[in-house]
């Protein structure tokens, strides 16, 4: 490989690394909301999986504890799926044209 080609590859790798960092920083700011029980339980989290808020409608507070726990878990899982989908969309633009093994998720 010629020296010029290697330098070009190094520049591309550095640019991709910078773009990846910017995308990860942006994902830390994007919030998604998961819901369960027709919106009576809501979980808000970032696309980096930091839970920011759990909202439980007051009408559920006197209800069955097991049901409430199930609704919180379902809302969390809904938010997690939305965060993953949003992350994949955002990272796809960064990794476009980059050959990745099947099933490999970014960010690592």
Curated annotation (Swiss-Prot):
Gene Ontology molecular-function annotations: DNA binding
This protein's UniProt keywords: Cytoplasm, DNA-binding
Entry GO terms, CC: bacterial nucleoid; cytosol
Coiled coil: none
Cellular compartment(s): Cytoplasm, Nucleoid
Region (Disordered): 87-108
Keyword Protease: no
Pro residues composition bias: residue spans: 99-108
InterPro entries: YbaB-like_sf, YbaB/EbfC
Pfam families linked: YbaB_DNA_bd
Family named by the database record: Belongs to the YbaB/EbfC family.
Main function: Binds to DNA and alters its conformation. May be involved in regulation of gene expression, nucleoid organization and DNA protection.
Subunit structure comment from the entry: Homodimer.
UniProt-recorded name of the protein: Nucleoid-associated protein BP1550
Organism: Bordetella pertussis (strain Tohama I / ATCC BAA-589 / NCTC 13251)
